[in-house]
């Protein structure tokens, strides 16, 4: 799977079409790309995210002890293993976005000093983990969004339901939903499914939305949770929320802010005559 094939080519074409508003092309390429890559259906398989043999992975890179770039990849977002960073925690409100019965709910655990851990990424015992580049879940989400934006709501829920069913959920109820409501729910599903994989900021830019962060209310902040500790014990803590809920200048999050853009380093600008 480390060598791109026809599925990967379609997998690259699909988000390109989505970005440029070619809805039909995006849906066709995404559905073609996903063929043959079965979705994960249990939390045990979902928790780890470090094995190239995962049926959902379309493109990835195997890592070994002698050929590993160590701490620069997904598996170091592990919040359980002492050798990982243990600092990439979920928004305390993120868990509220999941429906009862969703296998991904099993990945949440209150831990450390009151942080909500999301055990999606795990490092292997030998301190490595295969690197995921593309998987079929993203393809189903691209197809669903593209079809919804094209106005084919009945067709859009088909790939959405393929993903929902694999995650332990019933079919999406389209009754009474508008096009915008369906698109919003598909984008919400992208947040649930692709958390931690690097899609957040690009989706914010692509859809011209704002970062969504809420501070804990007084009532929420006063709650107590039994938080797992790395020695296997539990301690009671109040929950910890976001440290930053506004831009660096203190203003609220808004769409299309320059704060969302990554600046090209000055050294690169000076060294590259093509810029």
Residue ranges of each PLM-predicted region?
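Acidic/polar-rich alpha-helix caps and helix-coil junctions
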Residues: 1-73, 85-86, 92-275
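Mobile gating loops/cap/lid regions near enzyme active sites that modulate substrate access
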Residues: 79-80
């Amino acid at each position: 799977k480390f060598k791109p094939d026809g599925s990967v080519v379609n997998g690259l074409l699909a988000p390109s079409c989505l970005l440029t508003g070619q809805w039909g092309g995006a849906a066709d390429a995404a559905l073609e790309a996903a063929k043959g890559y079965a979705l994960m259906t249990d939390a045990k398989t979902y928790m780890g995210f470090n094995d190239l043999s995962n049926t959902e992975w379309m493109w990835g890179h195997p890592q070994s002890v002698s050929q590993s770039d160590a701490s620069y990849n997904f598996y170091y977002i592990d919040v359980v293993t002492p050798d990982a960073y243990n600092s990439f925690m979920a928004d305390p409100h993120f868990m509220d976005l999941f429906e009862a019965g969703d296998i991904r709910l099993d990945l949440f655990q209150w831990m450390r000093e009151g942080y909500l851990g999301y055990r999606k990424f795990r490092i292997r015992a030998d301190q490595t983990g295969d690197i995921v580049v593309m998987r079929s879940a993203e393809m189903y989400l691209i197809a669903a969004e593209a079809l919804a934006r094209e106005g084919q709501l009945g067709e859009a829920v088909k790939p959405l339901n393929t993903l929902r069913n694999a995650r332990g959920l019933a079919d999406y109820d389209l009754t009474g939903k508008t096009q915008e409501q369906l698109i919003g729910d598909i984008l919400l599903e992208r947040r649930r499914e692709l958390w931690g994989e690097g899609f957040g900021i690009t989706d914010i830019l692509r859809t011209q939305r704002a970062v969504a962060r809420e501070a804990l209310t007084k009532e929420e902040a006063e709650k107590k949770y039994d938080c797992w500790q790395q020695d296997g014990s539990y301690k009671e803590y109040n929950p910890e929320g976001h440290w930053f809920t506004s831009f660096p200048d203190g203003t609220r999050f808004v769409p299309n802010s320059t704060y969302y853009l990554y600046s090209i380093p000055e050294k690169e600008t000076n060294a590259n005559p093509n810029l």
